[in-house]
A protein has these predicted regions:
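Conserved histidines in hydrophobic membrane contexts and catalytic metal-binding motifs
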Residues: 1-456
Length: 456
């Protein structure tokens, strides 16, 4: 192996170490919370079956009658979302704000019985989703997750380079050498697991980044475009549909997040863009009319209805379907019942379709239990890689030292590294900025602070 190859190997190893040091805790958290959310379809019926299922009957109450039953039980509650029964044995769900709390009220759609409530933000799935998306600390958490995902991409790329056989036998490359012990065994386990999971992990990282607040938003603004003519005849506000999505609840599909929210009725003519009236709306059409409209438009069951909260607001019917080809987002005038926008899969451009498909694969929903098992396997491989990586580091680190891989003095002016850093900075600006910071710390501080021999 030439001096330059040896030098770049050490450089890749050093950056792989730094990436792993930062990424590993986040990857463990993302894998664990991802597993919880992955099995939501199985866990929810087991944990909340008494709230979610009802005996089927011949006649159901209207959506407005169901809402009245929910309000009678919780008169201070203000409706923020309605989820009609997805099938004949499902309860109706009303997400309501009550005294500062956001809770879901479950109603038997046939008998009008209030089955119970659930804190909409303080249940297993909501907590797992909030941790997975923003660590439950808002924007700062979102940026940290984005950084971790970006560094994860670098971790995978550098890991594949370090794994590359370079004339070695398949043993320890394509499968671990189970006859070995100690650090060599853990290194084999780490390298082989990382190799087999590399491509799938990249798909998971990149599809997940589509939801991040900084990179994901810029990505959507750049690539996710609808024909301007779709909105030319519709009065719109300065708000985008992304306001309907929260850390704990998904309402509209990713493809709709950067689309404008239409406004209702005569208020559209007098609206001051960017300033929405604070007073709640008093819609003239009934909730059942919106349900009937969704049925007539063949919206797939499992959709939600978000009512207007202002005099200019609209009803939004949205389904974030397991198969994105069944996605639908409808905005309905609260006064006339006119459909102001009806956006489906066929309206998405190629990038939006690819991203929506990636998101559904990411969440394990696209191909049923097969998709779930594949994502579960990826999560388990992430956990195994993280644990084995920590064990390798622990076994090779010198006493009292950090164990940073040695930096050779014959590196060729960091040219290759600078090209990689520049590429990552362009694709992932936050990652690029953090790379510069870590590079400076490594050159000016860490390389001197921990300058001691290290076993390869």
């Amino acid at each position: 192996m030439s001096t330059q190859k040896i030098s770049f190997y050490n450089l890749a190893w050093r950056w792989h170490f730094y990436a792993g040091l930062f990424v590993a805790p986040f990857m463990v958290l993302l894998a664990l919370t991802g597993i919880i959310y992955l099995f939501k379809p199985q866990l929810d019926p087991l944990m909340y079956g008494d709230l979610l299922t009802v005996p089927a009957a011949e006649h159901a109450l209207s959506a407005d009658e169901q809402l009245q039953r929910a309000k009678a039980a919780y008169p201070r509650g203000t409706l923020s979302k309605y989820l009609p029964p997805a099938d004949a044995t499902s309860s109706a769900q009303f997400v309501m704000h009550d005294g500062g709390r956001e809770m879901t009220v479950f109603v038997d759609p046939y008998r009008g019985t209030v089955l119970g409530t659930q804190d909409a933000k303080n249940n297993l799935q909501a907590i797992a989703r909030a941790l997975h998306g923003e660590l439950m600390i808002g924007t700062v958490g979102d940026r940290l997750i984005e950084l971790a995902a970006g560094w994860g991409v670098m971790l995978v790329i550098s890991g594949v380079y370090l794994w590359w056989p370079r004339g070695k036998s398949s043993s320890g490359v394509l499968w671990p050498r189970f006859t070995t012990r100690g650090r060599v065994f853990w290194r084999d386990l780490h390298a082989v697991t990382g190799f087999w999971g590399a491509a799938l992990l990249l798909v998971m990282l990149l599809s997940g980044m589509a939801w991040t607040g900084f990179w994901g938003k810029q990505y959507a603004e750049l690539w996710n475009r609808f024909p301007a003519a779709m909105w030319n005849t519709v009065p719109t506000s300065d708000q985008q549909a992304r306001v309907l999505n929260t850390a704990t609840q998904q309402t509209v599909p990713w493809a709709m997040e950067n689309t404008p929210m239409p406004v209702s009725g005569d208020h559209a003519e007098h609206m001051n863009h960017g300033a929405m009236h604070a007073a709640p709306a008093a819609p003239t059409i009934r909730l059942q009319q919106v349900v009937d409209l969704a049925t007539a438009r063949k919206v797939e069951p499992g959709y939600s209805i978000t009512p207007p909260t202002t005099a200019e607001g609209v009803f939004t019917v949205a389904v974030f379907a397991n198969d994105p080809r069944n996605d639908a987002t409808l905005h309905v005038d609260q006064y006339t019942g006119k459909v102001l926008a009806d956006v489906r899969w066929e309206h998405y451009n190629g990038v939006a379709r690819a991203t929506e498909t990636g998101v559904m694969l990411h969440e394990g929903k696209m191909f049923g239990w097969v998709n779930q098992l594949i994502v579960l396997l990826i999560c388990l491989m992430i956990l195994l890689s993280a644990v084995s990586g920590v064990v390798i580091w622990w076994k090779r680190r010198p006493a009292g030292g950090l164990g940073v891989p040695p930096l050779r003095h014959d590196l060729p002016k960091w040219k290759t590294a600078m090209v990689i850093m520049l590429g990552l900075a362009i694709i992932f600006p936050l990652v690029g900025a953090s790379l510069i910071v870590v590079w400076a710390l490594d050159r000016l501080l860490l390389s001197r602070l921990f300058a001691q021999p290290s076993r390869v």
